[in-house]
């Protein structure tokens, strides 16, 4: 009997050790959510989602996905009225299977825009095209996308509106048309304006965007959030908290860091950004723009939390320690 008890004890101990060794690694998303935020996410598309190593990190560490390219206009409506959703469907299905939130990106942007849209000069035609595109894309994923970047990069560095086919043909009214159409298409989705270089409170682009959003909200335009892309240079993190406060003061219900990457990926810079979001109550989440430097649009600058071999960097551990 003594031998059986000893054997039972050994088996129990062994099983506990095995279970412990198979536990998922620490998750930045889980730690961030435990601090009261909605998500810590990343961007991807079918290529990176079908990579086993990359996908494994996403499943373990990130709670939200943004399509890097598959929901942009050139991907979803390359020819007028002829929609293609294979890439976007893949991401949406992956997110549903793995319980990840989705930020839809992006409905109206001057870049990655098909030439047939860029060539429109008639107001009524462009209005109709804009409404049809937004409605068709959003209806396909209605109830599945937490937030949409409705308009993307519509400001110049001095805080004025950028020249684009949308602004040149419709004037500032394209913003109202886009947001009202989006609200009608999916009333439950959070509707965002998204831009880059919103990293300092007193910078012209930051104040100009915030002032425009305040005015538009006062006019009844349904803007819920501002997304700050936060593509930073090394050492560029010190102004992020102040900038988020400026954006939050515009009257939106939430702000988010939407495309984070930092040249050199220093622990100090990454922790500064994470703490900025934690300290700004309206900041609901952070999305880093990729998993591994291997797939980053800035790969030469090593800006992400995992290196080219998918190994976590010191900044990854620093974030977990800060949380």
From Swiss-Prot:
It is an enzyme of class 3 (hydrolase). Its EC number is 3.2.1.8. SUPFAM superfamilies: (Trans)glycosidases. One of its GO terms (cellular component) is extracellular region. Pathway: Glycan degradation; xylan degradation. The active site is at 153 (proton donor), 259 (nucleophile). Residues 43-322 form the GH10 domain. The keyword Secreted applies. Keywords: Carbohydrate metabolism, Disulfide bond, Glycosidase, Hydrolase, Polysaccharide degradation, Secreted, Signal, Xylan degradation. InterPro entries: GH10 (IPR044846), GH10_dom (IPR001000), Glycoside_hydrolase_SF (IPR017853). It comes from the Eukaryota. It catalyses: Endohydrolysis of (1->4)-beta-D-xylosidic linkages in xylans. The keyword S-adenosyl-L-methionine does not apply. Optimum pH is 5.5. Retain 85 percent of its activity in the pH range from 6.0 to 7.0 after a 12 h incubation at 25 degrees Celsius. Disulfide bonds join 277-283. GO terms for molecular function: endo-1,4-beta-xylanase activity. It is found in: Secreted. PROSITE patterns: GH10_2. Residues 1-23 form the signal peptide. Its main location: secreted. GO terms for biological process: xylan catabolic process. Optimum temperature is 58 degrees Celsius. The purified enzyme showed complete stability under 60 degrees Celsius. The promoter does not contain any 5'-GGCTAAA-3' sequence identified as binding sites for the xylanolytic transcriptional activator xlnR. Endo-1,4-beta-xylanase involved in the hydrolysis of xylan, a major structural heterogeneous polysaccharide found in plant biomass representing the second most abundant polysaccharide in the biosphere, after cellulose. Belongs to the glycosyl hydrolase 10 (cellulase F) family. This is Endo-1,4-beta-xylanase F3. The lineage of its organism: Eukaryota, Fungi, Dikarya, Ascomycota, Pezizomycotina. The gene is xynF3.
